[in-house]
A protein has these predicted regions:
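Structural detector for internal amphipathic alpha-helices that build alpha-solenoid repeat scaffolds
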Residues: 1-12, 20, 29-42, 51-54, ...
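Buried hydrophobic core positions in alpha-solenoid tandem helical repeats
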Residues: 14-22, 48-50, 81-89, 117-119, ...
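Disulfide-bonded cysteine-rich modules in secreted/extracellular proteins
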Residues: 17-25, 191-196
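Helix-loop junctions that connect tandem helical modules in alpha-solenoid scaffolds
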Residues: 24, 92, 161-165
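Mid-chain, structured segments of secreted extracytoplasmic proteins
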Residues: 59-77, 142-145, 193, 221-224, ...
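Beta-propeller blade termini and top-face loops
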Residues: 71, 124-128, 133-137, 244-245, ...
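Carbohydrate-interacting regions of secretory-pathway proteins
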Residues: 173, 180-324
Length: 324
């Protein structure tokens, strides 16, 4: 009789052992961090943990960031807010295991800003596996971002990573996912990430990005104590203010949004003459008609994007756009 050997039990996917390391580091959390978790809902505790971590050093800081990562798994915080918190955590940690866990978590934020931010870890061996998981997840949820040379390189690197882990659980599903993404990739299109660097505007400073845009998606983070005005199609359209909220230029109503730290992040979509805006994951303007500020003027059909700071100055980062 032919004896068929039982198929060996698949090893757990590598992230499981990473999770154990993170849980172990988190178990050494200091009393002041534990008190934050006892006194606050998880959503409210997360930014407080990041603030506390910034005041600590070495192992104490890493323990708090690890605890933050475990807490983040059990909250309904929007992907955009989570992206901002994870970036702060990434800037604070020096630990490779924690950074891998942050990179994986950034994949599950499903925002274009995260794709732009994570490019800096491409080609770094220590983070190749984490970046594979993040890239696959980000592109699966944003097929419109699946274009351009950088995304292609990240997808091929993800495929290589999964091949190295071929004997682990559910890797075939991940490989199928990444192969499908590679099949659906386009050379042209996707998010233009040529202007993602941190750009500081001093008092009443401005930044014009000269690409002529008609219909598009736009994402960026900003930091300002005052009001930041955004021109779209070469016309002032939106005003952002941390205290008051967001409003359309020429409108009196401010739309409040939640903040969790110094930075906020926006996603804007313009289709025809209608605009939709989300800030920190909250949709505040939904398909509202663009109106030319000088009454009676027709709306520009295309134009540049311009950021204008007030007396307080402003900083913008991770500016990326997708033409439609």
């Amino acid at each position: 009789a032919i004896v068929t050997k039982p198929k060996p039990e698949a090893l757990p996917f590598w992230t499981e052992s990473l999770d154990k390391v993170i849980a172990d580091v988190a178990s050494k959390t200091t009393d002041d961090a534990n008190k934050i978790l006892i006194d606050n809902k998880p959503e409210d505790a997360m930014p407080l943990l990041i603030k506390l971590a910034a005041k600590k050093q070495g192992d104490e800081r890493n323990a708090i960031i690890a605890r933050f990562l475990l807490t983040a798994e059990h909250t309904a915080t929007s992907g955009d807010l989570m992206y901002l918190l994870l970036r702060d955590a990434d800037e604070l940690t020096t630990d490779d295991y924690i950074r891998q866990r942050i990179i994986v978590a950034l994949g599950y934020t499903h925002c274009p800003q995260a794709i732009s931010y994570l490019r800096k870890y491409y080609g770094n061996k220590a983070y190749a596996d984490a970046l594979a998981v993040a890239t696959t997840e980000l592109i699966a949820y944003q097929p419109e971002a699946n274009a351009g040379r950088m995304v292609s390189a990240m997808l091929y690197a993800a495929k290589q990573s999964y091949i190295h882990h071929y004997d682990e659980k559910d890797v075939d599903t991940r490989i199928d996912q990444v192969l499908a993404a590679i099949d659906n990739w386009h050379a042209e299109g996707g998010y233009n990430m040529a202007h993602t660097e941190v750009t500081r505007m001093e008092k009443r400073g401005f930044w014009v990005i000269h690409d002529q845009l008609a219909d598009f998606n736009l994402a960026f983070d900003w930091l300002s104590e005052g009001t930041l005005t955004l021109s779209i199609r070469s016309m002032p359209v939106l005003m952002f203010n941390k205290e008051k909220g967001l409003k359309l230029v020429g409108d009196s109503k401010w739309h409040k949004y939640d903040t969790i730290g110094d930075w906020s992040t926006a996603n804007i979509s313009v289709n025809g003459d209608n605009i939709t805006v989300s800030v920190n994951g909250q949709k505040l303007i939904d398909g509202t008609k663009l109106v030319a500020t000088e009454s009676g003027d027709p709306i520009n059909k295309q134009g540049y994007i311009k950021f204008l700071a007030d007396e307080q100055g402003a900083t913008v980062r991770e500016y990326c756009f997708l033409r439609k």
